[in-house]
Regions:
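Non-heme di-metal
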Residues: 4-198
Length: 198
């Protein structure tokens, strides 16, 4: 089970994070620019999900999960921001921050289980989103350096997904939780399509 000791979060300088992900000298192929724009926008939203959840400071379980997941998502954002030219960043970053914060705050406010359902749903979508890009790069034998970065990010997103599912417990999702998960999937898909263009 991919559950880390949450008491041992070590912060690293940005340059060390970029080295850790082997992302120092990567040129984004033109065929990947839209995808990478959506990745950067998505990681921005993810960071702000956890910033919103941090406001529910009285819930220790949410606080602990947020502490670990936030650091990983922040690393991903640093890496995506380094790889993607600033001129290619989404013009709607303020929107992704607001939506991410709102999602994190609202879901955490409804309790730990609901927050776990939310994170599991988000990460399920993110895994599929990254896997689509990984498959594309494999198929086209394009930028194996970028491929390795995306694989590492995807693996860490899957860890978050497994963590959230494990913490939620084995109970089946309620009808509302299933509706909420589907809504997150549809909303995430819409956000990706918009961020690819703007």
């Amino acid at each position: 089970m991919c559950i880390r000791d949450r008491s041992k979060i070590v912060k690293m300088p940005d340059s060390n994070i970029i080295k850790k992900y082997n992302a120092s000298n990567i040129n984004v192929p033109s065929s990947m620019l839209d995808w990478m724009r959506s990745n950067h926008a998505g990681e921005t939203g993810a960071v702000w999900i956890y910033m919103g959840a941090k406001c529910i400071f009285w819930n220790k379980k949410i606080k602990d999960m947020t502490k670990e997941h936030y650091e990983t998502e922040k690393n991903h954002l640093i890496v995506m921001g380094h790889i993607l030219p600033k001129s290619s960043h989404s013009k709607l970053l303020i929107l992704w921050r607001i939506l991410g914060f709102g999602l994190g705050f609202f879901s955490a406010l409804l309790g730990y289980r609901f927050f776990c359902v939310t994170i599991q749903s988000v990460e399920t979508f993110v895994e599929e989103h990254y896997q689509e890009q990984i498959d594309f790069l494999y198929k086209n034998s394009t930028s194996f350096e970028l491929l390795r970065v995306l694989e590492k990010c995807c693996d860490e997103e899957v860890e978050h997904q497994i963590d959230a599912k494990f913490q939620k417990g084995n109970d089946k999702n309620t009808g509302f939780e299933r509706f909420w998960s589907n809504l997150i999937g549809s909303g995430s898909s819409l956000a990706v399509n918009i961020s690819k263009q703007y």
